[in-house]
Amino acid sequence: RPLNLLISGASGVLGAALKPLLTTGGHQVWTLVRRRPDRSRGEIHWNPERDELNLAGLPPFDGVIHLAGDNIGEGRWTDAKKRRVIDSRVLGTGLLARTLAALPVRPAVLLSASAVGFYGNCLDCCMREEDPAGGDFISDVCSLWEHAATPAADAGIRTVFLRIGVVLSPRGGALQRLLATRA
């Protein structure tokens, strides 16, 4: 049956590939945007920095795919950049998790992005999902990021963390930059 889905980060490399795949599969896909939304395109405004997200009046979501977060591969890792990386993940995830938990009809699942960096920098280790977080900046970010989804899990929403590695696509991310150097 067609599903009613909500996606954050739909303009990123993964979201931009996922949304058309889901819509051509017959699913209704709503997207969270920070700019002025176009409701005819299924867009919903949100602003994690201001704790703004209103899902009232929308049909219940079967699932939510949360991919939003500042691109860690762009720019120098200044203190301000690190703060953006943390806030874009923790504030957005927390807002989304709290909002979903408060809905009268909650989604069955929240798929929330995280990163393989959760485990830290261990080049000669084979990691398992249940292994603890590492002890570096990215590990700390991932731990905070995943913890921010607690309200959704506590409300009975199945919460799954997608510990994503380097995204390889000619449409963006690391591979696009590598391919550009060959041109």
Regions inferred by a protein language model and the residue ranges of each:
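Conserved glycine-rich Rossmann-like NAD(P)H-binding loop of the short-chain dehydrogenase/reductase
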Residues: H27-R34
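Catalytic helix-loop patch of NAD(P)-dependent Rossmann-fold dehydrogenases
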Residues: D87, L123-F161
